[in-house]
From Swiss-Prot:
Official protein name in the record: Xylose isomerase
Organism: Bifidobacterium longum (strain NCC 2705)
PROSITE patterns: XYLOSE_ISOMERASE
Entry's family note: Belongs to the xylose isomerase family.
Subunit structure: Homotetramer.
Annotated Gene Ontology cellular component terms: cytoplasm
Stretch forming the signal peptide: none
Binding site for Mg(2+) 1: E232, E268, D296, D340
């Protein structure tokens, strides 16, 4: 059985019925969908922080999680033990990627030098396990938000010593990424923002973080670290207002600071909701702007206004996400679906780590199957083509091709009666569109054996 009292998770389809717990009903890793294996479309990753470090605390209570490595009370002993548990979990789930923050994998020392020594010991063991299992690092990142020194930010801190420390910490993190062959490197600015504008020099802070990003890019080039750099937008929490508010804001920041050749975006479902957007909206913005890099797979709760990091189970959302991915051709150049998600506080058994990942993996596999069926039928493409058909000829075509002026538009419209203008509009039949998507979900998944 191994370290975890769970067998390897296998694909069973729908044959054993909906109550089969420890099996995939829709995720068939080697099944070819739209010209690629399912595993190559989805490129699932496990998040070290939520999976192995999360004790399932909440603001009103202590942790409830049962984890086998809690028997190790020394922080370094536990950190090293987690590596063995982690790689067995990856293999039993059939997941080929993982992600971590530097401070997830090893305890901090009193100085950066001591902390780096701790990291080296754990990275040695991670590297050995990567070589023996073939599991790869989707991305790594640096925790520049948990320690109290980052109370007012890291690369936007008003305290130069903290900025300098952040740079030193980031240097080591990039070296680890290079050593472990990370395909991406993520920057999430949890403390990069402000609590109050009265005491904040916003331009100075954003200029500082832009300089920081340029230094990181320069050092990555110096050491030959070729990972795709990614910014992960989030509007707030823990900071009142974060500078990487959403996809559009982050893209504008990159354009303003000459960073568009270096960065793309890592987008998270629950972060999109906090910014007042759907996950599909954020992916669409990034995709159509050429900045789609990778995805963090989770969801929020419609009734709760903070970052819940639930495992994704909403099929309507996973269909929308995978439809966008199909249009893009991939989740970015080297991206994947990292489960930045944790079991609920009441799901505290060891086995719930497996149950929750199975739920998320099946939800996205189902989303891919439905999106592929919609794509094959051209349902969305035909819907959009019909809606914008007035731009295929006449004045519409001239507008699309940039061949008109305001004077031309005035001349075209001056004598058109209201009745003719109203007649030019058409109903969207939105309720039928949504019903048809529901039908695709039901029908496409019914075809799975």
């Amino acid at each position: 059985m191994g370290l975890w009292d769970v067998d390897k998770i296998e694909y069973v389809g729908r044959a054993k019925g909906p109550k089969e717990d420890f099996a995939f009903h829709y995720y068939d890793a080697d099944k070819v969908v739209a010209g690629k294996k399912m595993k190559d479309w989805l490129r699932f990753g496990v998040a070290w922080w939520h999976t192995f470090n999360q004790e399932l605390v909440d603001p009103f209570g202590t942790g409830t999680a049962h984890r086998p490595y809690y028997k190790y009370t020394d922080p370094m002993d536990q950190a090293l033990a987690k590596v063995d548990y982690a790689f067995e979990l990856f293999q039993k789930l059939g997941v080929e990627y993982f992600c971590f923050h530097d401070r997830d994998i090893a305890p901090e020392g009193d100085t950066l030098r001591e902390t780096n020594a701790n990291l080296d010991k754990v990275v040695d063991k991670i590297e050995e396990n990567m070589k023996s299992t073939g599991v790869k690092l989707l991305w790594n990142t640096s925790s520049l938000f948990t320690n109290p020194r980052f109370v007012s930010g890291a690369a936007t801190s008003p305290f130069a010593d903290i900025y300098a420390y952040a740079g030193g910490q980031l240097k080591k993190s990039l070296e680890i990424g290079k050593r472990l062959g990370a395909e991406n490197y993520v920057f999430w600015g949890g403390r990069e923002g402000y609590e109050n504008l009265w005491n904040t020099e916003m331009k100075r802070e954003t200029d500082h973080i832009a300089k920081f990003f340029h230094m990181c890019a320069d050092y990555a080039k110096e050491i030959g670290f070729e990972a795709q750099f990614l910014i992960e937008p989030k509007p707030k929490e823990p900071t009142l207002h974060q500078y990487d508010f959403d996809a559009a804001t982050a893209i504008e920041f990159l354009r303003n600071h000459d960073l568009t050749d270096v960065f793309k975006l890592n987008l998270e479902g629950n972060h999109a909701n906090l910014a007042g957007h759907t996950y599909q909206h954020e992916i669409r913005v990034a995709r159509e702007s050429g900045f789609l890099g990778s995805l963090d797979a989770n969801q929020g709760d419609k009734l709760i206004g903070w970052d819940m990091d639930e495992f994704p189970t909403d099929l309507y959302e996973t269909v929308a996400v995978m439809w966008e991915v199909l249009q893009a051709g991939s989740i970015g150049p080297h991206g994947g679906l990292n489960f930045d998600a944790k079991p609920r506080r009441t799901s505290f058994y060891e086995e719930d780590l497996f149950r929750s990942h199975i739920a998320g993996m099946d939800a996205y596999a189902a989303g891919l199957l439905v999106a592929d069926k919609m794509n094959q039928d051209g349902f969305i493409q035909n819907l959009q083509a019909e809606r914008y058909s007035s731009y295929d000829s006449g004045i519409g075509k001239d507008i699309d091709e940039g061949n008109v002026t305001l004077a031309d538009l005035e001349a075209y419209s001056l004598d058109k009666p209201q009745s003719e203008l109203i007649a030019a509009t058409k109903s969207d039949h939105l309720e039928s569109v949504k019903a048809t998507i529901n039908n695709y979900i039901i029908d496409a998944l019914a075809e799975v054996e």
